[in-house]
């Protein structure tokens, strides 16, 4: 199972002060050195964290596959076609949300999406849809022409956090059924959202069905905590 590292929240820390550090590019280099299989970045319409130049720099400077998460808008599409990431993952987007709250509704937007992704296909850019683990959405993704789906694991993660084990088992079964159908239809299957060091073992049970996990917040959170002592010691060393 591959790991895609989402570095959005490195930019979130930077944008909290509207400054130049921490460097998103350096974070991508670190992820590559650590063995990550892919860098994931979400270029949101409001540019709340990742900026256009961040994506350009990572794409041109780091020899690692880039997965660009994006809303299916014409503006972001133009940028994506210029940068040419190895993959685009289409996600729903609301300006008022803190993070992506659910999957893209392929069923209701199939005709639009089928036309929207043509340019990516012509440019040999893999197209993935971020969807809830719903069988109808999986089938619609195949019909629309996607190469892959990324299953939204948010409800699974929330039920784990709340220790709602009945709902947790239901969500895990939904993920299993959706992944199984997707594989039968010839789609690549990825997953992400809310996966942590504590709940990942349950997702690993689906290793034969899910090929890749995209994880960001949990990794960055742990990096802040476990790197804090080292950073303080380094500063004290300089002072002394």
Swiss-Prot record:
Annotated metabolic or biological route of this protein: Cofactor biosynthesis; pyridoxine 5'-phosphate biosynthesis; pyridoxine 5'-phosphate from D-erythrose 4-phosphate: step 5/5
Localisation per UniProt entry: Cytoplasm
Record InterPro entries: Aldolase_TIM, PyrdxlP_synth_PdxJ, Pyridoxine-5'_phos_synth
Key words of the record: Cytoplasm, Pyridoxine biosynthesis, Transferase
Swiss-Prot/TrEMBL site (Transition state stabilizer) positions: 150
UniProt keyword RNA-binding, yes or no: no
Record-listed E.C. numbers: 2.6.99.2
Keyword DNA repair annotated: no
Stated family: Belongs to the PNP synthase family.
This protein's name: Pyridoxine 5'-phosphate synthase
Organism: Hydrogenobaculum sp. (strain Y04AAS1)
